[in-house]
């Protein structure tokens, strides 16, 4: 049996003609929000466009959607997915007098209050916080972080139902409208703000393909979002962003109801001790892999490339290790939203992911997934797992899946084949969703269905093979494994074949 250590001792990091299978998500900002730049980003490796709804107007986000679709007209290439990242429930400070930034020395004592009369008149003596229940949930001795942890305060006393007495633990400046984190404290904020609800309705109206749901704490939060998306948004995939201790604690229940997960390490690294983040990342990714749910690794992956043309060695290792952990997607934030080198950042991420994929011990990984998956599995999963096993034995170059909904494609991706998964579908939305799953290369078949089912199967299969040749996945004489159904529609994938191109 192949071992992980044995695989690594023989590691060949020459990628040759291999194609990257990890998807790349890029946040679009003013510097990249035009069709021409989006085309270049896609050529560099971008698969999913992210809109950050913490910033920008509806007019701006509409322009991102329009430009993303225009880029596909200019450069058809592979289908491009569009994701809406919600602002989510959050806690913020009030407005300082004249918007002045007040210096705070260490051991400075002051008041945090939820009294609305201070909302627009904060200073270095009294700071308004917009979370009304903060005095009910926090305890003496707890730490409060302001501005992503730039300032830390210890709670000295819960004075009354509106007032906390706090002491600064370090020097800094207290400013208007900064984020507030309460590490180790369970908060009872609503799953969605009114802004979030409006944003989701905007996303449904504009046909976004996925929602990155911020600050998910319970499974109920996902169900609330699904309710807001409604019938018109029933096909939108919900990706739960795990950003706090509550989300980690309730992860198993969240995983059951979400379509996928994002390990959002920014706020997570504030809410839990930073040294624990890498371990939590590995645990969450492993659970997603076993469940067959897509998982995204995000935040500061190539942060230095916001202003520098080359990444740090630690950043390259971070991207590579996220791929080795089992992430389906890796994400760029400021690097592509406001950075000086957005295209280079995507290229760097693509090149790093490609090399990292050569380091994955595919057979041991497959064995782990098969052994740990509860039996019996549904027919479609049994076929998917068998297809991946067949690629190892037959030395196949690709798995071609004729798919309607994309679910069988998801299951094939779960078992981490060492070859591309070529998805042929008539469903353009399913083709875009599948970028959430590692290794999937989608092609939309636009021809009407043939009268004879077998003729239609062969036509779609030939289409997938020809497109794969164009992309460099297949050549004449290559062996492929195919999955198809015995009838049209969803849920009939039960036939596996081994063919020669």
UniProtKB/Swiss-Prot annotation:
- Specify which residues bind K(+) according to the UniProt entry for this protein: 52, 54, 85-86
GO MF, any single term: kinase activity
Q: Where does Mg(2+) bind?
A: 243, 267
Residues where substrate binds? 50, 266-267, 299
**Gene3D superfamilies under this entry?**
Phosphoenolpyruvate-binding domains, PK beta-barrel domain-like, Pyruvate kinase, C-terminal domain
Q: Which UniProt keywords apply?
A: ATP-binding, Glycolysis, Kinase, Magnesium, Metal-binding, Nucleotide-binding, Potassium, Pyruvate, Transferase
Q: What is its EC number?
A: 2.7.1.40
**Pathway as given in its UniProt record:** Carbohydrate degradation; glycolysis; pyruvate from D-glyceraldehyde 3-phosphate: step 5/5
UniProt GO BP: glycolytic process
Q: Where are the transmembrane segments?
A: none
- EC category: transferase
Supply the Pfam families for this chain. PK (PF00224), PK_C (PF02887)
GO CC term, one of those recorded: cytoplasm
Query: Reaction(s) catalyzed by this protein?
Result: pyruvate + ATP = phosphoenolpyruvate + ADP + H(+)
**Site residues by UniProt (Transition state stabilizer):** 241
**Binding of ATP: at which residues?**
52-55, 92, 178
Cofactor or coenzyme needed: Mg(2+); K(+)
Q: Which family is this protein grouped under?
A: Belongs to the pyruvate kinase family.
Subunit organization:
Homotetramer.
Q: Please name the NCBIfam families in this protein's record.
A: PRK05826.1 (NF004491), PRK06354.1 (NF004978), pyruv_kin (TIGR01064)
Q: What is this protein called?
A: Pyruvate kinase
Gene symbol? PYK1
């Amino acid at each position: 049996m192949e071992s992980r250590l044995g695989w690594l001792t023989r590691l060949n990091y020459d990628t040759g003609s291999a194609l990257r299978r990890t998807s790349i998500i890029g946040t679009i900002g003013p510097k990249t929000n035009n069709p021409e730049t989006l085309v270049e980003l896609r050529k560099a490796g971008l698969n999913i466009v992210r809109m950050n709804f913490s910033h920008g107007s509806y007019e701006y986000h509409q322009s991102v959607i329009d430009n993303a679709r225009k880029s596909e007209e200019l450069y058809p290439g592979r289908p491009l997915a569009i994701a809406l990242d919600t602002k989510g429930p959050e806690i913020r400070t009030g407005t300082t007098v004249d918007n002045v930034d007040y210096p705070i020395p260490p051991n400075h004592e002051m008041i945090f209050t939820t009294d609305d009369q201070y909302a627009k008149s904060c200073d270095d003596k009294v700071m308004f916080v917009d979370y009304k229940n903060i005095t009910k949930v926090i305890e003496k001795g707890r730490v409060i972080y302001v501005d992503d942890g730039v300032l830390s305060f210890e709670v000295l006393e819960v004075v009354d139902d509106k007032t906390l007495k706090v002491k600064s633990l370090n020097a800094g400046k207290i400013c208007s409208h900064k984020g507030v984190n309460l590490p180790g404290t369970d908060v009872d904020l609503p799953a969605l703000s009114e802004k979030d609800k409006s944003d989701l309705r905007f996303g449904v109206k504009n046909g976004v393909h996925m929602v990155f749901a911020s600050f998910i704490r319970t499974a109920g939060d996902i169900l609330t979002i699904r309710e807001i998306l409604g019938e018109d948004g029933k096909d939108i995939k919900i990706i739960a962003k795990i950003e706090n201790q509550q989300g980690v604690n309730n992860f198993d229940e969240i995983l059951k109801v979400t379509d996928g997960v994002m390990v959002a390490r920014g706020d997570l690294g504030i809410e839990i001790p930073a040294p624990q983040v890498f371990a939590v990342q590995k645990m969450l990714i492993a659970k997603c892999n076993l469940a067959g749910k897509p998982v995204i690794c995000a935040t500061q992956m190539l942060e230095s490339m916001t202003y520098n043309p080359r990444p740090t060695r630690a950043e390259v290792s971070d991207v590579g290790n996220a791929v080795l952990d089992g992430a389906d997607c890796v994400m760029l934030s400021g690097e592509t939203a406001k950075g000086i080198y957005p295209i280079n950042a995507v290229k760097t991420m693509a090149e790093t992911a490609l090399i990292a994929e050569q380091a994955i011990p595919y057979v041991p990984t497959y064995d782990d997934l098969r052994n740990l998956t509860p039996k019996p599995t549904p027919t479609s999963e049994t076929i998917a797992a068998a297809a991946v096993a067949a690629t190892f034995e037959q030395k196949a170059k690709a798995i071609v899946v004729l798919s309607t909904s994309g679910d069988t494609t998801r299951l094939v991706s779960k078992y981490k084949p060492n070859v591309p998964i070529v998805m042929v579908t008539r469903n353009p939305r399913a083709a875009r969703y599948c970028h959430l799953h590692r290794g999937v290369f989608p092609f939309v078949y636009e021809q009407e269905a043939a009268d004879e089912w077998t003729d239609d199967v062969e036509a779609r299969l030939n289409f997938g093979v020809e497109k794969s040749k164009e992309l460099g996945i297949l050549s004449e004489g290559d062996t492929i494994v195919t999955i198809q159904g015995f009838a049209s529609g969803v849920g009939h994938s039960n036939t596996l074949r081994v063919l020669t191109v």
